[in-house]
């Protein structure tokens, strides 16, 4: 979208201008350009902080009621490694999830597994201090946390591990 010549975009967009290529949606907030949503669909999505706060509220409600699962199976070795490398248990993981805020939100992804393409996966990041299991040092660990909230409100924590690359945060 072109600027109106003043360097500003039309006010009708409230500083949230989304553009789309074949797979990539980009948002402009003020002068900041962020890639946020990766869909191959022909629609533009608009997410605001209230949307994420609502989503997190539903996730936290499920977690508080133990209506969730943190995946630690053979396909989720990175999740297992977090629990092997640091002194962390399910209780601490639950505390971390319950401490998430909209400011920790990074992006929404489409589930790429065949038959589940309609599902949306929400990615968050969180810096936490954890004790290394093989040492005496505490370390600030940047976590990558990805949720799938199913239609029945059950939450699957698909990813809960150290970030492999720095995340871009949507509201920061």
Predicted features, each with a name:
Residues 7-9, 13, 21-124:
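Compact soluble domain cores
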Residues 16:
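Extracellular glycan-recognition regions
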Residues 102-154:
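Functional cores of ribonucleases/endoribonucleases
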Residues 147-172:
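A short, surface-exposed interaction/processing loop segment used at functional sites
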């Amino acid at each position: 979208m072109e600027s109106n010549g003043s360097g500003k975009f039309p006010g009708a967009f409230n500083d949230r201008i989304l553009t789309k290529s074949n797979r990539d949606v980009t948002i402009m907030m003020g002068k900041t350009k962020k890639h946020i949503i990766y869909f191959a669909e022909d629609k533009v999505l608009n997410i605001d902080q209230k949307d994420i706060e609502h989503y997190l509220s539903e996730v936290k409600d499920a977690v508080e009621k133990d209506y969730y699962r943190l995946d630690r199976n053979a396909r989720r070795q990175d999740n297992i490694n977090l629990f092997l490398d640091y002194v962390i248990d399910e209780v601490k993981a639950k505390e971390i999830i319950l401490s998430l805020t909209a400011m920790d939100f990074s992006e929404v992804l489409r589930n790429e597994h065949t038959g589940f393409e309609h599902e949306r996966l929400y990615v968050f990041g969180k810096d936490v201090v954890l004790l290394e299991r093989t040492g005496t040092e505490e370390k600030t660990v940047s976590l990558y946390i990805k949720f799938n909230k199913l239609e029945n409100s059950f939450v699957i924590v698909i990813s809960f591990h150290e970030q492999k690359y720095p995340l871009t945060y949507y509201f920061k």
